[in-house]
Amino acid sequence: MNNSIVTYETFHGSAKKIAEVISDKLNCKCINIDTPFEAEDLKEINNIILVFNFRGPYTAQLTKLYLNRVKEQLKTKNVILVGEGLFSEKEFPVVAEEIYKNNPSKTFTKFFVNGQLRMDTLFPEERVLLKKFSELTGMEIKDMGELDLNKAEEIASEIENLIDTEEFKSIKDVETSENLEEKGTKWVCSICGYTHYGDNPPEKCPLCGVPKEQFKEQ
């Protein structure tokens, strides 16, 4: 599927391993984030798959800076984010808001590959964050052992099926903020910052999955 490209961060080697599994499955190019998109021909690319390791504030900030750098290239693409490790309560809103802000009319999908985690090495405040994360996502928080490349294979297959759907095949015009605002009341997810326009909030947030009660009218 050469209408996709996989890009990964270089701070953690596990992100590269996952990216290679996905690109092999999709038969598409795999580049690291130090390779500028400007050097790639993206005209025929519909789907950009981002692979990042999430272990702390540094990688969250790295992701945000990278997404801001490539925001023009993301505007007309479907974005798939594969996170290895765990998001913290502080990290996920940073990433989700950045993607949605720059990509409001295209599809955004997220997957997780459980990575290395040792519960007995965590600080108390980190345990609190993980508990909140577990409640929000339904992911069980436990010692994870080594990088789960079998899970990466499963996700690669899910992505392969996903990008073959009509929703991902169709290229829509990017809607401006003005056009979105004409659609009604502005609702903002209090957890991840996703913005929805309409008479009512969505039943659940398409980014972080929380119920509509978490949306605030603005």
What would you call each of these model-derived segments?
Residues 2-25:
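N-terminal beta1-alpha1 ligand-phosphate binding loop
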Residues 25-29, 47, 56-181, 187:
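FMN-binding flavodoxin-like domain, especially the glycine-rich phosphate-binding loop
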